[in-house]
Amino acid sequence: MSTVVTEINTTQVYQLYIKADPEQIWEAITQPDWTQKYFYGSRTSFDLRPGGHLHAVAGDDESQELVEGEVLEADPPRKLVHTWRALYDPELAGEEPSRVTWEIEQGEDGVSLLTVVHDRLEGAPKTAANVAGPGWMYVLSGLKTLLETGRPLS
């Protein structure tokens, strides 16, 4: 996996090749049954209309809210843009929402390029530090492993 992290306080860019078509990647990003297997056990659901909501929840009864956001743009299976506000820590929840952009490009031989940009982090320095560590790397490694092997990373 290729990772580029620039200006940690404002923009983080991650790129990786996944042996899967864009439709498979899109489904894995947007469907709670998939996200639960690689996104720290959270079930992430999207209302894929502009202004729609993003909710990531955990727990047997799904009562633990982890992340919330608003869908800004959805162009299946190529691009998804949404805001991001972490709720699992009171300090993070008190910060301004940031933005996450997922872009999926079809490549050759069944391989696609996934680019994830987490930006607008100027008002969310603790979030920036939190996701720059193992955060996005773990999530994206888990996504790649799941799609390529059919099994979760851990």
Language model segments and positions:
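Short acidic N-proximal helix/loop "leader" segments that mark the beginning
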Residues: 1-13
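A generic structural micro-feature
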Residues: 6-8, 61-65, 92-96, 110
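Short beta-edge strand/loop motif at the mouth of beta-sheet-based domains
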Residues: 13-14, 33-66
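Hydrophobic/aromatic beta-strand elements that line small-molecule binding cavities or substrate pockets
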Residues: 16, 67-73, 98-106
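Short, conserved beta-turn/loop elements at beta-strand boundaries and strand-helix junctions
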Residues: 75-80, 109
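Beta-strand/loop substructures that line and gate deep hydrophobic ligand-binding cavities in soluble
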Residues: 90-137
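Short, highly charged C-terminal tails/helix-capping segments
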Residues: 145-154
